[in-house]
């Protein structure tokens, strides 16, 4: 069965200030064994049996930065951070993206639609002290699906078309997280 995937994959090298690597991860937003309502009236996609493909409540991955900096700096996401997807706009509006959490601080909170159609300004992740060598910084990324959205027919049609090969490729959702280290005077 096809799946929705979140991929986070960015490399950046700023020799004067720092070097870091941002790893990649996959999040399955769709599973083929999920039943969200046992056939109750009005439930999304679900029937009395498990769906062909149905949304999970949420999936979480991790941005991992390996940071080295000789100077005091700020690590943050910049305007290269965006979503690329072939999902219809209607579905994009129901997918929420949260970068960060209450322990690390919320870096971004919005919808896939916002990230794919709008701009992203600089968002601070963490202050980096001078003489930092090989520090690993992790930031969670959570994508959640608003299940009670009244779009059962659309979601079912997309799932059926994907599973029967009506599309040339799977539906994809890629989050490109552009990150920078900025020197702090």
Please place each PLM-identified region on the residue numbering.
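Short, polar/proline-rich extracytoplasmic segments that appear immediately after membrane translocation
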Residues: 1-53, 165-171, 176-185
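Surface-exposed interaction patch
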Residues: 4-5, 50-120
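C-terminal, structured domain-capping segment
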Residues: 6, 62-77, 124-185
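Generic "edge-of-domain/loop-turn" microfeature
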Residues: 9, 20-22, 27, 34, ...
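Surface-exposed charge patches in extracellular/virion surface proteins
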Residues: 21, 32-36, 72, 80-82, ...
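Generic preference for hydrophobic/aromatic residues in regular secondary structure cores
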Residues: 21-25, 32, 67, 75, ...
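Feature targets compositionally biased, intrinsically disordered low-complexity regions
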Residues: 22, 36-41, 60, 75, ...
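Extracellular adhesion/glycan-binding regions together with long Ser/Thr-
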Residues: 40-55, 105-153
């Amino acid at each position: 069965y096809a799946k929705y995937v979140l991929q986070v994959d960015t490399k950046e090298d700023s020799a004067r200030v720092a070097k870091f690597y941002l790893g990649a991860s996959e999040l399955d937003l769709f599973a083929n064994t999920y039943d969200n309502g046992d056939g109750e009236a009005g439930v999304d996609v679900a029937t009395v049996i498990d769906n062909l493909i149905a949304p999970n409540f949420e999936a979480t991955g991790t941005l991992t930065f390996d940071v080295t900096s000789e100077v005091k700096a700020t690590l943050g996401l910049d305007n290269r951070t965006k979503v690329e997807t072939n999902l219809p706009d209607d579905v994009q509006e129901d997918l929420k993206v949260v970068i960060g959490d209450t322990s690390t601080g919320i870096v971004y909170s919005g919808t896939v639609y916002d990230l794919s159609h709008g701009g992203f300004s600089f968002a601070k992740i963490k202050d980096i002290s001078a003489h930092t060598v090989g520090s690993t910084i992790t930031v969670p990324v959570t994508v959640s699906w608003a299940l009670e959205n009244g779009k059962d027919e659309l979601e079912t049609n997309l799932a059926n078309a994907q599973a029967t090969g009506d599309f040339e490729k799977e539906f994809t959702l890629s989050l490109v997280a552009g990150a920078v280290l900025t020197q702090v005077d």
